[in-house]
Amino acid sequence: MRISRKWLPWGQLAATCAMRAQHVGAAPNCADLTRPGLFPNTIVQTAAVVAADAKTGMPAYCEVTALITPVVGSKITAVYRLPESWNGRMLGLGGGGWAGILNLLQPAAISGPFRAASPGLTRGYATAQTDGGHSSTFVTDASWTRNNPVAVTDFSHRAIHEMTVLGKQVVASHYGRAATKNYYQACSTGGRMGMMETQRYPDDYDGVVAGAPVYSLLVQSSSVVRDQIFKAPGAAISIEQIKLVHDTVLSACDAKDGLKDGVVTDPRRCDWEPKSLQCKSGVADSSCLTPSQVNAVNKAYQTVRTRTGVVGNYGLTRGSEAGWNPFVSTTPGPRNVLNGDLGDIVPLMFGDSGFDPATFDIEKQQAAIHRTVFAAEYEANSTDLSKFFNRGGKLLLWHGLDDPAPSPFATLDYYERTVKANGGESVRFFALPGVYHCGGGPGADSFDPLTALEQWVEHGAAPETMVATNRAAGIERPVCAWPKLPYYRSGDPSKAGSFVCR
């Protein structure tokens, strides 16, 4: 999954949140948390105070590392950071990719879908993270899944639940009282984990932010379908041609929101056709597209379904082309784990370690993928959130409209099905124009859904708009509750107030 350096404007909120923090005075001895038998099925490996750092703005906190073993063979590592100045809440954080990386603290190290704990700590949250039940060098490594059903279950849902249950116990033991509210926030795989919490473990959290969630194996099947599209004879297109397509799309559709700013606000309203770039007879260079290339780009935009209506691939959005690589390999070359090479999860998805994803046929195999044992553990597709919602839980979904990995339309589909099943009082979906996977892109990608979630859960103020920024571009945009999107009205185009949600 894509690693982004942008997501939330945490720093500007630190001062405000510090004022709200409940100063608990002299906290219990951090090392006391290592006492044997204090927590069931758990070995607390370390517990030590980390001093405040004036340079980074990090507060002093107690850092606890624990090994959780709920079943035989399970090895879930979790880390908890308990600030001296606590705001009375706990914040669960999810992983990215295939997880396996745990000790994420500073935003400069890794951010976006693998959001570090430091933003929550600076706001006074006790934070919780897990490696998902296994250790990896890279989040794209899925080798740990080989003949390891316990680890697969841990990664799919058990690890994040066990992390949360123990986290509540650690918080109560350290501070002498339970957290008043428990929130969760993550993107990508972490978004899926958050959705899984609302579906399987509805008592864990009071509110969940799930960004660009990889909640279905559609992400994997789509990567194969897209690879097949551009691996067809004569279909591959160069980086220069991708830029040509992108620039032409912007020329046709950028201004439909009232402002030319390099972003197609609503890709559904963009009716540009690739055939307009087809080369004249006898011409074949980067200034145009051959018929085979036109066909490939057309297919990339199209949602593909089986005859019975099962989606095998949601189309890429017009305007997202500049962000296709590395998730969509349009040029000749080997596959990788992001764009069609399923590697170690082939036997989990297809039941055959020798299956060649290049031969994948949506009509023959798509429905079967969702019936596998792996899908039953991994997919967070249930819309029965009655237990979560009935206890006051709130779900805030968001997705970048230019995301070339998990499709924003998949998240929209889940949102609409959830509203149909439960009503729309306790769920919101926010689409971010021009934003890639969990961040990046020409759109405004840095915003604060956690504060909106807090206000919703604690004060009943359902979010309708937020403000997002793109610091590099120096712009602000409203983030609008679906089905609304931001349209330019008048005034300074760099300010959110110059736009209206409609």
Please report, for each region that a protein language model flagged, where it lies by residue.
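Bacterial N-terminal signal peptides
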Residues: 11-20
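Gly/Ala-rich beta-loop-alpha elbow adjacent to hydrolase catalytic centers
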Residues: 186-190, 194
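Bacterial N-terminal signal peptides that target proteins for export
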Residues: 2-11
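Catalytic-loop region of hydrolases
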Residues: 23-89, 101-107, 114-115, 246, ...
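Short beta-strand/loop motif that positions the catalytic acidic residue
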Residues: 397-399
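Conserved alpha/beta-hydrolase "acid-adjacent" motif
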Residues: 405-409
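Cap/lid segment of the alpha/beta-hydrolase catalytic domain
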Residues: 97-176, 222-223, 230, 354-377, ...
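A catalytic-pocket lid/entrance helix-loop region that shapes and gates access to the active site
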Residues: 196-198, 203-305, 431, 451
